[in-house]
Amino acid sequence: MNTGNIVTDSLVGYWKKAAEDRGIEFQSEIDIPMEMPFRGVDVSLILGNLLENAAEAAEKAERERYIRLKIKYDKRNLLIIVENSYKGGLVRGKGEELRTTKADAANHGIGIPSVRRTAEKYQGTVAIDDAVSGHFVIRVILYGLSTEKVT
């Protein structure tokens, strides 16, 4: 992985290897510059949470086990799409927010809410699509409205 963006390259490289070690097919399509108007720690939080969740879910899938990652930067906006296979149904809480299915729920289930909070820093959005059984898609858009350059 060599996009020139060290934060993204490191995280994607780590999760690609972790997925493949678990027998999960990992595909990525990444088109981003070295510098973007988003803090590296924020992009790391989003990517790390999404890819960790995807790897955990895909590992439990019965048939196809895959993760597909697309990251695109265009006109100061960043689009991150993660698709993955999973088994079973999603559990939703109040407000349709996803809930963890892990037994130790008190120590889990903070990933997607933290992704939402981070996206909101950039007036961004998080959309989840699980309309197709066994196929989960999450889309995160960050808007680079500031003229300040952040690396």
Question: What spans do the regions from the language model cover?
Answer:
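Conserved short strand/loop->alpha-helix "switch" segment adjacent to the catalytic nucleotide/phosphoryl-transfer site
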Residues: 4, 27-46
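Short beta-to-alpha transition helix within the HATPase_c
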Residues: 4-22
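Conserved ATP-binding N-box helix of the HATPase_c
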Residues: 40-63
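Short beta-strand/loop element within the Bergerat-fold HATPase_c
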Residues: 66-76
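Glycine-rich/acidic phosphate-handling loop/turn and adjacent ATP-lid/helix
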Residues: 78-109, 149
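Glycine-rich nucleotide-binding loop
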Residues: 88, 131-139
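Glycine-rich ATP-binding loops of the HATPase_c
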Residues: 123-130
